[in-house]
């Protein structure tokens, strides 16, 4: 088909609203990941391990976090999947893509440990997923690893009927355990950018914490 640059993108809200909510809710994963991406970037910066081409940029990081704030603030609109809720997700995706290439193909402010977890999970299980489910599970994991699981995120998930437990993805906790045990080596073997996962050493404590949070969200 060759190379083409779209001149415009049209959004049909009615078509989006008619889709199963699990697909639309899935879009939150690729906004929440801005938060854990920035945490990983800050983690690398504090240890002088940022790539020379992707040095920590506080202005870019701050701008990225604003989209997370806006997403969380629009929980009711997202829950109802009205136009304002859809826009809060689309705006973040649009900015994320644009800022990726405009900052020198820098993924630091939009992706980190949450996606690395997902990539390894997909690699080990050889399964395909609704993207937002494993990413949101990885987001909770990343927040726990950074000790930054804020209450606003728990409340956000409580208000959405979006199940991203292993069972909802036809997995079990053994799959998650295996993913965690091999996470560090996966990151290193695939030359993924340095973050908290690069230093991660598996312990049952992190699994217990993750399972506890997911079990609580399932019971809401």
Please identify what each model-predicted range represents:
Residues 1-63:
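A glycine/threonine-rich phosphate-anchoring loop and its flanking beta-alpha core
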Residues 9-11, 32, 71, 89, ...:
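Generic structural hydrophobic/aromatic packing signal, biased to beta-strands
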Residues 33, 44, 147-220:
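C-terminal charged capping/lid subdomain of soluble metabolic enzymes
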Residues 34-45, 52-80, 208-220:
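Phosphate-rich cofactor/ligand-interacting catalytic cores and adjacent structured alpha/beta frameworks
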Residues 54-161:
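Active-site segments that bind and position negatively charged phosphate/pyrophosphate groups
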